[in-house]
């Protein structure tokens, strides 16, 4: 289930870094406009990023998801085996990968490498933080006409 993804990722970081990992889902009442996604985000107690969502492909969304699970956002060190992160990505996208789905992130990318290295994020992009208590938080938003889902991970150190 979706909640197991949240618990598994949070537990992987439990002793290594202060981390916050959340998964949200609901029926889509916000439409397909990136400017309206902040209403969904705010309804979950997260920070608005003023509609600054960047549309990305499914492959990019999956790659970012795997890196979010397997690497420390602040240090770039491995905190979970890539194979386990890939399994969690499969579980998440099983729920949020319909043919008409679109994917968004809160990255503002200057230059997008084919496989993003989160540790080098500051060389490529800036990021609007979603979690109000996190130094850095990155999210993947999946939306289609029926449902909206968000995976977000943050770190303080």
Place the predicted regions along the sequence by residue.
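Long, contiguous N-terminal structural blocks used for assembly/anchoring
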Residues: 1-105
